[in-house]
């Protein structure tokens, strides 16, 4: 029954049945054992292979059975345990290769087998081979001609291949089917994701309406007239078609990113994509051990979930197409949840805009990031505070001294240049010492210096005798408008120069607030900032050799006796006297340009001032010009109406000080 079924079966079925039993038959083991026992009796001395003992008798019986089998008619009934299209070739010399044996069969004009294999036992050839033919007639012809043929002194033994018992065959077939099913299931599960993605990419061009239905009502509700022509609307409506048309994707879709608005860069991306579309991509095979688990809270059988997942997945992989993916803010809560979960799963970032949910990648190259920040106006937050910033002056007090010196040196250079270029005129320096008080006035073209009135020792009294000086200063400073206030006097003590200098520094602690404000902060009209008590410590000052005095408009009243001036004026001011030529050049021309050119000035010798060189004057505080000098000196901030203005101008750099409690003593 089995023989007739094999005869009528097609060659493919016969081949499958034969292959299933090639390596799993007891006949193979018996043949191997026989060939091993036969090789033990080979006479190696004469070089002739002879068979002795029981092996020769067994071989004789096999030859007889083979002869009887060959003499039987081909259409007769064969044994039930043989395969009519498969043969076993035994006793092959070890030195004969498979190709050589096939050449011998071809030289004998025998039909060649469609499958021919040597059998190896633990990697060692034992003289056994299997051959499969397409028809039983070819098999019978090969057995008749090849059986008993001597090759290299050994006679070949060719016979039909025996089949295993029925129970054993069923067991082997069942194991093979189970193993084949497991392999197919594993291959199918691993390739489903990639196949679905490819099919969705190919069919997304025809399914554009499903994508438009998802967002049509939402997009129509958000200012349809203005949104119809916007790049983001075109991007959302054409998202599915863009996934399929890889060559024309950027031609039909404007870029969402702010970096790629230039037409030249836009065209470059189109050309690059056209070139890359023809290249081959070697896709990596997915592995169950490396694939991340999809989120369990989402149903990927839902069409909306699959559509959003496809869009986000393509956006994540196609970095050169666009840098942002936008969804309208009016989508449903379920869609927002799907987008949020999928962004977390794919490693994307959500940015909420007033009208859109913008999806971005976490990885962005540095050049595009800097360009994006510049266009968004966010570059200032990416850089640390510079030394000239008042916000960082609290912890950058070391560099502020060097800034003061540099700015004072620049101001001194500009003074010297103006003195050389201007014409020469004389300016008299008068001395008003009726009460024995030295008078020093120091006014800048940009802003006035604080008035120093140290309990009667130093007071500021302008004495202008030159006609030109009166013309230039009549609108800014007029001594006639300032009533003379009685100044308290102190007795003169005979001290050394060093002691007088130290006493001058100590007097600043008891001065009115006029000596505690940087000169560059106020305007040129009156000494508005002279009542500021916010300087940290007036007793600490840099060395006098490093403090260039603010002497752009200096009018110094000299007493009749020079020795008396040297006793009452600090050493730092003794070497700073200017000639009348320089005084006029500094006063006259610079006063007219006081509003157009503002020069930075030092802060009255205080190391701990928190003002930067950019803090000039505040226009909102000029309303206090009606106050006279006495009010400016003796009135506090709250009484003079300057409290709010000074607090607004200085709170950014003097945040560590108490602006309310002005009677509080300094602790440093």
Swiss-Prot record:
Residues 8-23, 189-212, 420-449, 479-508, 552-567 have a biased composition (Low complexity). Pfam families: RRM_1. Residues 37-46, 168-188 have a biased composition (Basic and acidic residues). The modification Phosphoserine is found at residues 56, 189, 191, 194, 197, 393, 466, 541, 636, 638, 640, 653, 655. Residues 24-36, 47-74, 450-478, 509-551 have a biased composition (Polar residues). Involved in normal G2/M phase transition of the mitotic cell cycle. In association with RAD53, also involved in checkpoint control in response to DNA damage. Residues 85-163 form the RRM domain. Hyperphosphorylated in response to DNA damage by MEC1. The modification Phosphothreonine is found at residue 305. Residues 1-77, 168-214, 374-398, 420-570 are annotated as: Disordered. Present with 4630 molecules/cell in log phase SD medium. GO terms for molecular function: mRNA binding. InterPro entries: Nucleotide-bd_a/b_plait_sf, PIN4-like_RRM, R3H_Cip2, RBD_domain_sf, RRM_dom, RRT5_SRSF_SR. It is found in: Cytoplasm. This is RNA-binding protein PIN4. Disulfide bonds: none annotated. Interacts with RAD53. Keywords: Cytoplasm, Phosphoprotein, RNA-binding. The keyword RNA-binding applies. GO terms for cellular component: cytoplasm; nucleus. GO terms for biological process: DNA damage checkpoint signaling; G2/M transition of mitotic cell cycle. PANTHER family: RNA RECOGNITION MOTIF RRM DOMAIN CONTAINING PROTEIN, RNA-BINDING PROTEIN PIN4.
């Amino acid at each position: 029954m089995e023989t007739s079924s094999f005869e009528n079966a097609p060659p493919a079925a016969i081949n499958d049945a034969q292959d299933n039993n090639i390596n799993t038959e007891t006949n193979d083991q018996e043949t191997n054992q026989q060939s091993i026992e036969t090789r033990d009796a080979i006479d190696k001395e004469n070089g002739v292979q002879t068979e002795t003992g029981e092996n020769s008798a067994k071989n004789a019986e096999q030859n007889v059975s083979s002869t009887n089998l060959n003499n039987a008619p081909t259409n007769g009934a064969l044994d039930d345990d043989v395969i009519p299209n498969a043969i076993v070739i035994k006793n092959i010399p070890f030195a004969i290769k498979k190709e050589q044996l096939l050449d011998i069969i071809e030289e004998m004009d025998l039909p060649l087998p469609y499958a021919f294999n040597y059998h190896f036992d633990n990697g060692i050839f034992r003289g056994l081979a299997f051959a499969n033919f397409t028809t039983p007639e070819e098999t019978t012809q090969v057995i008749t001609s090849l059986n008993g043929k001597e090759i290299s002194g050994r006679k070949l033994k060719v016979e039909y291949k025996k089949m295993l018992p029925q129970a054993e065959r069923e067991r082997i077939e069942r194991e093979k089917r189970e193993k084949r099913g497991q392999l197919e299931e594993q291959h199918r599960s691993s390739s489903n994701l990639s196949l679905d993605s490819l099919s969705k990419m190919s069919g997304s061009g025809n399914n554009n309406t499903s994508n438009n239905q998802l967002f049509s009502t939402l997009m129509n509700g958000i200012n349809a007239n203005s949104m119809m022509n916007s790049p983001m609307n075109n991007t959302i409506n054409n998202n599915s078609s863009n996934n399929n048309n890889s060559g024309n994707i950027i031609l039909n879709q404007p870029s969402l990113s702010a970096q790629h608005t230039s037409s030249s860069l836009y065209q470059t991306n189109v050309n690059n994509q056209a070139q890359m579309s023809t290249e081959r991509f070697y896709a990596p095979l997915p592995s169950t051990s490396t694939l991340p688990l999809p989120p369990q809270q989402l149903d990927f059988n839902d069409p909306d979930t699959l559509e959003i997942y496809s869009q986000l997945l393509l956006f994540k992989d196609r970095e050169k197409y666009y840098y942002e993916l936008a969804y309208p803010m009016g989508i449903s809560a379920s869609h927002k949840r799907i987008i949020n979960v999928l962004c977390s799963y794919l490693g994307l970032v959500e940015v909420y805009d007033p009208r859109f949910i913008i999806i971005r990648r976490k990885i962005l190259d540095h050049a595009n990031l800097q360009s994006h920040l510049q266009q968004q106006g966010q570059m200032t937050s990416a850089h640390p505070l510079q030394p000239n910033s008042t916000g960082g002056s609290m912890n950058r007090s070391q560099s502020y001294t060097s800034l003061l010196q540099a700015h004072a040196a620049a101001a001194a250079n500009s003074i010297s240049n103006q003195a050389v270029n201007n014409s020469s005129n004389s300016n008299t320096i008068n001395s008003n010492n009726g009460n024995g008080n030295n008078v020093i006035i120091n006014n800048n073209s940009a802003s006035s210096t604080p008035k120093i009135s140290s309990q009667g020792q130093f007071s500021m009294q302008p004495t202008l005798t030159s006609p030109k000086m009166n013309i230039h200063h009549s609108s800014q400073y007029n001594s006639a408008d300032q009533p003379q206030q009685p100044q308290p006097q102190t007795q003169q003590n005979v001290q050394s120069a060093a002691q007088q200098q130290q006493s001058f520094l100590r007097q600043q602690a008891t001065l009115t607030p006029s000596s505690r404000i940087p000169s560059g902060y106020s305007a040129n009209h009156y000494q508005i900032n002279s009542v500021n008590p916010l300087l940290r410590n007036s007793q600490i000052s840099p060395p006098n050799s490093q403090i260039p005095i603010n002497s752009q408009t200096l009018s110094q009243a000299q007493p009749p006796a020079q020795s008396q001036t040297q006793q009452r004026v600090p050493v730092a001011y003794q070497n700073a006297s200017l000639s009348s030529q320089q005084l006029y050049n500094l006063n006259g021309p610079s006063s007219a340009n006081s509003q157009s050119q503002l020069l930075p000035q030092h802060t009255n010798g205080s190391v701990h001032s928190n003002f930067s060189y950019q803090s000039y004057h505040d226009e909102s505080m000029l309303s206090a010009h009606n106050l006279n000098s006495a009010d400016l000196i003796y009135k506090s901030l709250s009484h003079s109406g300057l409290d709010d203005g000074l607090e607004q101008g200085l709170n950014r750099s003097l945040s560590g000080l108490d602006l309310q409690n002005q009677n509080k003593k300094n602790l440093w």
